[in-house]
């Protein structure tokens, strides 16, 4: 199945894959290497703060990785890094997807810790995190947090209310030194055709 999907993506002109939101099967990484795909290898979907598991609620009991983060995050991340670091297609390590800590004072301390593990084990690759709150309301990602990330990942810039049509322009002007990547974005239209995956 993976081979067929990756070959379809290649036919569409895609040259990179984001693994989300946990370490992928090594067989997928082997295929990406074989077929010439760049890869963003991602470790976590939650840190200490749980995500809402149901619409409109963040008060229910967590059944996610946040329950195990303190006990397992260092071992889990280091295991992924040591296992995957020799895959030539990997171009970025991702330490998280839409992590609630991005809006919390002190959240950057965890970002520094996790990035540190990545840089210690593999100093050749940059570290990213997929942010979905960069210009969100009422709380947005803190610059103190994003400043600790090598490559700031932008998720769904088109949904940020008054900035919805500005996309990356405002940040490009305000943060000239910020390296960014679109980590999760819908197509602006179905230009190339529809593909059946």
Positions of predicted regions on the chain:
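Active-site-adjacent "gating/activation" loops or surface patches in catalytic cores
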Residues: 1
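Substrate-binding/catalytic cleft of secreted carbohydrate-active enzymes
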Residues: 5-9, 16-197
